[in-house]
Amino acid sequence: AKQGCNVVVNYCHGATAAAETAALCKELGVEAVTVQADVSTAEGCKKLFEEAVNAFGRVDILVNNAGVTRDNLILRLSEEDFDTVLNANLKGAFLCCKEAARRMVRQRSGRIINLSSVVALRGNAGQANYAASKAGLIGLTKSLAKELAGRNITVNAVAPGLIETDMTAALPEAVRTGMLHSIPAGRAGKPEDVANAAAFFAAEQSSYLTGQVLCVDGGMAM
């Protein structure tokens, strides 16, 4: 929104948060709409993109940032929790990429940014499902980058480390302290750090970058 882009805010359950996000976008002088849709289903993705096109006429930028966790050690990790995470984090991104690519190929332009994670590169005990989903996003990113580059469409990934969010705030103090010790910068990042990376990949300045994974992690993945 700060770069002058109209915004479509997708949500599945968080209507209030989506409305607040849209309101913040409008305060910056752009148009914004919210769309309730489950992106882990083809029907939900189709609805999302149809409403986006109805609102603004085209889709120029896709940011796949849906993410859920269902943490547990492998011996306790249920098939249901594995499927829930893979469906939301990886299948949903695949379906959204497919809908976006269909339109961007016709436009001969577009930007796709996938939100991965440093756990895709490092692994993390108790997060086999989450790490697998985020590692899958990197493979998806690189494959689609090769498929779509000839149509002036870039596909890149941002891999955040420990970021100050509601989800990380709920971590036990011992876990949080251990994670901070593994970060050379010695601190957690801010949501703005991730947003700035995504905005860079969406901008004209990054038009010759595709298939890249940018770690926003204070050196955690080195």
Q: Model features per residue range: what roles?
A:
Residues 117:
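Residue(s) in the substrate-gating loop at a strand-loop-helix junction
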Residues 45, 73-74, 78-86, 168, ...:
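Substrate-binding pocket helix/loop in short-chain dehydrogenase/reductase
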Residues 68, 75-94, 109, 113, ...:
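Catalytic Tyr-X3-Lys loop
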Residues 102, 146-150, 207:
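Alpha-helical segment proximal to the catalytic Tyr-Lys
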Residues 1-56, 70, 79-81:
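Short-chain dehydrogenase/reductase
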Residues 97, 133, 141:
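Active-site helix of classical SDR
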